[in-house]
Amino acid sequence: MAPPLLLLLLASGAAACPLPCVCQNLSESLSTLCAHRGLLFVPPNVDRRTVELRLADNFIQALGPPDFRNMTGLVDLTLSRNAITRIGARSFGDLESLRSLHLDGNRLVELGSSSLRGPVNLQHLILSGNQLGRIAPGAFDDFLDSLEDLDVSYNNLRQVPWAGIGSMPALHTLNLDHNLIDALPPGVFAQLSQLSRLDLTSNRLATLAPDPLFSRGRDAEASPSPLVLSFSGNPLHCNCELLWLRRLARPDDLETCASPPTLAGRYFWAVPEGEFSCEPPLIARHTQRLWVLEGQRATLRCRALGDPVPTMHWVGPDDRLVGNSSRAWAFPNGTLEIGVTGAGDAGAYTCIATNPAGEATARVELRVLALPHGGNTSAEGGRPGPSDIAASARTAAEGEGTLESEPAVQVTEVTATSGLVSWGPGRPADPVWMFQIQYNSSEDETLIYRIVPASSQHFLLKHLVPGADYDLCLLALSPAAGPSDLTATRLLGCAHFSTLPATPLCHALQAHVLGGTLTVAVGGVLVAALLVFTVALLVRGRGAGNGRLPLKLSHVQSQTNGGTSPMPKSHPPRSPPPRPQRSCSLDLGDTGGCYGYARRLGGAWARRSHSVHGGLLGAGCRGMGGSAERLEESVV
């Protein structure tokens, strides 16, 4: 008989193992093997003393903190090839002894900053074969000092936590292959002195920045920790930026060039160093001069060519680099936008295009035309300064001397919604950049501006309010006297006009439409009446003909007293009495003439129906009446 203590231990051990799993108690370690068991979640009754837990090849969809709570002795956790789409925050929070975590072959799309919190002694992290598109910058912070192997291959990553990866001094193997990575930060691997394998295969890398890490693989015997580097399957752009890599002379790799076209498809290490060349930047087109009104958006464009693609910068009039701000935006393609221009934005801007082969510059002139502001006058030269429309009208009313020599402003050809503004040529001694028309109406006090080229002497105002009074002033914008002055504004004249009231254009059209409608209606009534009358006559004639059907008599023989009487002689049939002559007979007699008359009647009716609308407007109506009478006489 077994001792009671041994039976108790066996019973407790059997109860601790989940039913679908296999538990192995090898020496002091306990392994729980639950692979290929069809599990939908982590078994809740797993022994908390488990050292190795294998849950691979199941259908687990999510992980949460209760799944591994109090499993402080767990060293190896395998969750490969499940259907995990979500890892809750601090799901591994109690796994302080965990050394190996396998999450490959799942459906993870994102790793948050707290998804992997807890395993501070983690050494091997396998995340390959998921659908990861983003890994939070702080996702690896708990095991930066201990991690030795990191595998994030076969995902959809464009970026990885480079700052965290660059701070892993114990990292030996880094697999980044088969992702969408298109750039490596310069010097990102400088601190990885223990790195022995770096796999960058099948990404989107067109170039690689120089890094001391790559030179360790050139001489494996001299390097304390030789590097196995693989970056084949990338669209390498073989120009001067990769000349440093070409000089490493690694004959064991099979990389090829994807561009430029002259080197596409050639073996990378077989291309002579002299063919790894670059082209200096060349400004292809740019804005030369731009004039905008104060407050408008200004767009300065600059396009450059070169190999590699030049980096674009802008320098403002104050010789400072123009960066993105709340008012200005510098785009990578060389476009500079200023949202709301002011007088201080005017000046010369410099577009700078740079690449490793050199730089190119272009000058762009921005002129900001200041709008008139109320209360500002210029005493120099006797010219009025910037002024709004109220001040301009007041100045015109006071009769300043400057207006007497200026041409008058006239508004002619005024309609309900438009008016033609005309003015004469200005004084030849005064250069004019452009004219500015200011106007507002009694219906809306909003001041409206219109800019007219200096070569014009008239302007058509459109979209005016019907029946409204307008005040209009014309100003000339001229160059300032000094480089630091604002644009000079000179008043040419003012005018007052009123638009015509809105005229209902539908009266004449209404009479015309009503006349046409009445004609069509009367014609329709007459046509309908003629149709009804004709059908009635045809029906009446057919009924009369059926009543006069001739009776056909057969010969009758009579037999009396059983005797037979001789057959009477046959007499020739008597001809029917003559009938009165008619134009047409509708009985069942001779119908040949009726058919001809019907054809004539149908043709006349077709001709008359085609000309009914014309007959309604003239003698046709009278002709139609006469035809109807003749038709009645011929049928009845």
Curated annotation (Swiss-Prot):
Residues 17-518 are extracellular. Glycosylated. Residues 281-367 form the Ig-like domain. SMART domains: FN3, IG, IGc2, LRR_TYP, LRRCT. Residues 540-636 are cytoplasmic. One of its GO terms (cellular component) is postsynaptic density membrane. LRR repeats lie at residues 49-70, 73-94, 97-118, 121-142, 146-169, 170-191, 194-215. Residues 556-585 are annotated as: Disordered. It is found in: Membrane. Its main location: membrane. Residues 17-48 form the LRRNT domain. Residues 405-502 form the Fibronectin type-III domain. Promotes neurite outgrowth in hippocampal neurons. May play a role in redistributing DLG4 to the cell periphery. The PDZ-binding motif is required for neurite outgrowth promotion and interaction with DLG1, DLG3- and DLG4. Forms heteromeric complexes with LRFN1 and LRFN2. Can form heteromeric complexes with LRFN3 and LRFN5. Unable to form homophilic interactions across cell junctions. Interacts with DLG1, DLG2, DLG3 and DLG4. Belongs to the LRFN family. This is Leucine-rich repeat and fibronectin type-III domain-containing protein 4. The lineage of its organism: Eukaryota, Metazoa, Chordata, Craniata, Vertebrata.
